[in-house]
């Protein structure tokens, strides 16, 4: 069940950034660095209970993070 949900989140995240897997990898990497440095999550997920990668993917899938917004935060 969780695998299906993760796959659908990744599919939605890819759709939100134009189906570019390399861009998704880069966005997730940068966002995980930000979260690790103390940035607040933009979704209702506790970083102590969830993997930062999962949080970053959900943020992208929900449209809260994209290439323009990630550049502003760096």
Swiss-Prot record:
**Reactions catalysed according to its record:** RNA(n) + a ribonucleoside 5'-triphosphate = RNA(n+1) + diphosphate
Record EC number: 2.7.7.6
What are the GO MF terms of this UniProt record? DNA binding; DNA-directed RNA polymerase activity
Show the GO cellular component annotation of the record: DNA-directed RNA polymerase complex
Task: Name the InterPro entries for this protein.
Answer: DNA-dir_RNA_pol_omega, Pol_omega/Rpo6/RPB6, RPB6/omega-like_sf
Instruction: Report the enzyme's class at the first EC level.
Output: transferase
The biological process GO terms on file are: DNA-templated transcription
- Recorded family membership: Belongs to the RNA polymerase subunit omega family.
Known partners and oligomeric status: The RNAP catalytic core consists of 2 alpha, 1 beta, 1 beta' and 1 omega subunit. When a sigma factor is associated with the core the holoenzyme is formed, which can initiate transcription.
The record, for HAMAP family, names:
RNApol_bact_RpoZ
Q: What is this protein called?
A: DNA-directed RNA polymerase subunit omega
